[in-house]
């Protein structure tokens, strides 16, 4: 005979309520862009579940990781911004930066040795611990890198279209100023997100007598690595995005430079005549 007992309250109504508030607020504030944002969220969640099932079925995890990063970048930026030069530039900037982070991570491990992956909170098994952690690091910083990439490419696009006589030197100076503004905020956002994720376990272990040095060495070292790798990605995304954007808009810049040079020449000629 099958029997059961009540062991707790069913709290999924609260989650459904929050989802409802989120959808209503997003559509009310952003309109059509909010609907596109919801489409990207749904597509990325479905793709993430599919990629996890591929890994469970025995597929190569690094190949899955590469496909996942490409899919997230392409789908998110194309659905939200459409097929345009600035979005293609943002996609290329994101992928170049992400795979640069991957290469730097591998080079660092080759010189310093492997991390103690057995100290992670949840271990899926004895194999692929390094790849699982690396995948989490790359996916974790992907959003920040995408944000920086689309910001820089959009800024270059707007500057070239709005200021017809802007020179390459002026454009690079503007990109540098934009990069300074977004780097500081994005790095702090990344830090706060990782602090929020590990705050409960940190407080719990401090209450139970863990000292701060032991906590950093054995418990939050992985969070620190995630933050540092993501911060390097944000910093790297600014010059990479700038180079990609300048290459994509170089035809416009050459015309702009010639216009600026012609304007300077006209001014010089008029001054000589005077």
Locate the predicted segments by residue:
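Short juxtamembrane and helix-loop transition motifs at transmembrane-helix boundaries
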Residues: 2-7, 21-33, 52-60, 158
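Loop-to-transmembrane-helix entry motif
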Residues: 10-13, 58, 175-189, 228-231
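Hydrophobic alpha-helical transmembrane segments of membrane transport and translocation systems
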Residues: 28-29, 195, 201-274
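Transmembrane alpha-helical segments that form the functional core of multipass membrane systems
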Residues: 32-120, 130-134
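Hydrophobic transmembrane alpha-helical segments of multi-pass transport and channel proteins
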Residues: 99, 141-148, 182-187, 223-243
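Short helical (or helix-break) motifs at transmembrane helix termini and adjacent helical loops
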Residues: 143-159
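Pore- and gate-forming transmembrane helices of large, multi-pass membrane proteins
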Residues: 147, 168-202
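Juxtamembrane helix-boundary/capping and inter-helix hinge elements in multi-pass membrane proteins
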Residues: 159-169
């Amino acid at each position: 005979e099958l029997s059961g007992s009540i062991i707790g309250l069913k709290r999924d109504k609260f989650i459904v309520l929050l989802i409802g508030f989120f959808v209503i607020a997003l559509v009310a504030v952003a309109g059509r862009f909010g609907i596109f944002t919801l489409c990207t969220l749904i597509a990325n969640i479905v793709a993430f579940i599919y990629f996890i099932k591929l890994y469970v079925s025995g597929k190569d995890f690094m190949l899955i990781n590469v496909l996942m990063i490409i899919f997230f970048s392409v789908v998110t930026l194309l659905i939200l911004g459409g097929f345009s030069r600035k979005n293609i530039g943002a996609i290329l900037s994101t992928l170049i930066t992400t795979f640069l982070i991957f290469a730097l991570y591998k080079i660092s491990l080759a010189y310093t040795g492997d991390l103690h992956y057995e100290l992670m909170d949840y271990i899926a098994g004895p194999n692929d611990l390094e790849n699982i952690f690396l995948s989490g690091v790359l996916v974790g910083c992907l959003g920040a890198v995408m944000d920086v990439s689309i910001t820089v490419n959009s800024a270059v696009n707007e500057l070239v279209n709005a200021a017809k006589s802007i020179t390459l030197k002026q454009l690079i100076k503007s990109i540098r100023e934009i990069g300074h503004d977004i780097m500081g905020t994005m790095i702090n956002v990344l830090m706060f997100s990782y602090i929020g994720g590990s705050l409960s376990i940190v407080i719990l272990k401090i209450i139970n007598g863990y000292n701060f040095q032991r906590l950093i060495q054995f418990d939050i070292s992985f969070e620190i690595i995630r933050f540092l790798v993501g911060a390097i990605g944000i910093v790297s995304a600014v010059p990479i995005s700038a180079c990609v954007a300048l290459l994509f808009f170089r035809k416009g810049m050459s015309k702009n430079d010639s216009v600026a040079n012609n304007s300077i020449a006209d001014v010089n000629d008029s001054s000589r005549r005077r």
